[in-house]
């Protein structure tokens, strides 16, 4: 028994399922999860001391790589002054100014402590601002675990094989409408059915919780136009894509302007941080300037703000996103080339620092229903083969992969050589 396996057995005695977030349990791929002891650059190290090239990156935040010296130094300096004050700090102001300078649609921003808090608060604000109850989301998209959002959710809930989570009253769920991602007709149909009841659309601009599905041309702008036509707000959930797809997020990359944006992951530099922001007239509707209540004991935590600011400043380096995109393209297209070489059907998607691969004969994956038709068993075999080779991918066929600036020539070469060996083995066994 490895030390990770022993720790997992120990953890299950005191922690539900042995983990603090379901996807970490490896239910989607089988076997026991790795328990991680440390990380540096492009590598994570398990409890047995084995190194892995990491394509999870703490599920997205580690865009510069693990244990980045500038972020570590910023955190250590901040700790010298105390851990939490429950009062305003200059760091919060600096973070707000940095976010606003990078995302043109955000005129004011409120810090919170998680992506779920950000989306939950943005939806409450949209409902309060429009005085409407219903929201519209998309099948396969994931926006955190708030009750109103776990309706035909993606990510871990998708692995459970349930359209929604138990414990959510029907009275909550009835206010959440679910459309088909990349299908404007399904959105318009719902708006025509409820023309004055929908407060907002919330969307992952690149769906990262049914693997990685970019928007088809015109889709995001089409949503913007429908919101304008029916008086609803458009919320772009950039918890995953914010500052990962481009310096101004997916909204900047695709040229669409939302009313509200939710952020997380990258803005925390690895610390627990979320944020929501947007039009000033909408944001002024939040307490204390407006009637919509929202609060948080640790919101704007100085340690988290220090880590986030250090990362955000580093992301302003010229040419960084072009380099990151090139790395991502190389890995995604390298996987596809290896699969083609060995006669194993595979489709790929990638944008910015995100990528996805699908074991399928479908030439292109753009919708949730296509994702559910992919070969999950082949993914599991590939996953464990890569893990044995020292490459750590997301332990679910429904999660995106992430590159970092720390992934260099050596790491990419080793990864693609490993993929070639694993795919060759899969073909030989078929």
From Swiss-Prot:
InterPro entries from the UniProt entry: 4pyrrol_synth_GluAld_NH2Trfase, Aminotrans_3, Aminotrans_3_PPA_site, PyrdxlP-dep_Trfase, PyrdxlP-dep_Trfase_major, PyrdxlP-dep_Trfase_small
Pfam family, one: Aminotran_3
Keyword Disulfide bond belongs to the record: no
Domain of life per record: Bacteria
Pathway: Porphyrin-containing compound metabolism; protoporphyrin-IX biosynthesis; 5-aminolevulinate from L-glutamyl-tRNA(Glu): step 2/2
Cofactor: pyridoxal 5'-phosphate
Primary location recorded for the protein, binned into one broad class: cytoplasm
GO biological process, one term: protoporphyrinogen IX biosynthetic process
Enzyme class, spelled out: isomerase
Keywords: Cytoplasm, Isomerase, Porphyrin biosynthesis, Pyridoxal phosphate
Reaction equations catalysed: (S)-4-amino-5-oxopentanoate = 5-aminolevulinate
Modified residues (N6-(pyridoxal phosphate)lysine): 265
Record's subunit section: Homodimer.
Family: Belongs to the class-III pyridoxal-phosphate-dependent aminotransferase family. HemL subfamily.
HAMAP family reported for this sequence: HemL_aminotrans_3
Name of this protein: Glutamate-1-semialdehyde 2,1-aminomutase
Annotated organism of origin: Shewanella baltica (strain OS195)
Taxonomic lineage from the root: Bacteria, Pseudomonadati, Pseudomonadota, Gammaproteobacteria, Alteromonadales
Gene name as annotated: hemL
